[in-house]
Amino acid sequence: MKKDRIGLALGSGASRGWSHIGVIKALVSEGIEPDVVAGTSVGAMIGAAYLAGNLDKLEDWVRNSTRKDVLQFFNIGFSTSGFVDSDRLSEFLTTQVVSPDTNIDDFDRPFAAIATDVGNGGVRWFTEGNVVNAIRASMALPGLFPVVRDEERRLVDGGLVNPVPVSVCHAIGADIVIAVNLNADLVGKHSRKKSVSHAEKAPSAESKQNDEDDGGGFLKRVKRTAQDYSESIFSSDDDELGLFDIVASSINIFPDRLTRSRMAG
């Protein structure tokens, strides 16, 4: 009997995308190695780092980076190309994610990065060519990251047209797709209180056992691992939203609705 090929669709979601690292590690710990990977925006970056064998390296940077490390990417003299300095972004991608001369064909399994064509609102799949260029195009959030030119096209963040690339995973060979939607329940998220009691936050030993005994135990363990990972990086007592949070959250309201319709169909 033919073995089903597993696809991993890593969605867009700004800084929430670091949670993808936790999801991948949880899957690998369960003995699940995806045969196909497709990513949109930050999902494309994490997916490429995984296939390049640099996931641990990227995780170390995320955990150890300071506010100064992040601010160095921004161009204070804002121009039409965006706030983020393209040279510094490229340097980050080539030192932390993948080597500059790596092509998608160099990976040991199919990979796709999703971008949006500003000219016609269409979708652009990167399934070949330079990986760094593909990532930059896929995560070029309008106004924040520089627009990427690809021949006659101007490309921006793929989250505008396909936030969670399930359909792309199927198209490049997957039979079953594990989709990671970072925008689920985004609206109203910040209205909830961040401080949760230990009893509310941590499941009891009994509930953990029940989770592992029922059919959904695997998915619950993966979700718990990803949540714990995300909280370990972004735990903060500051309830104030920064400019980036506001802009990214506003932009991601539309992808959330689009994602639901695409995953349903």
What spans do the regions from the language model cover?
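Patatin-like phospholipase
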Residues: 1-40, 48-265
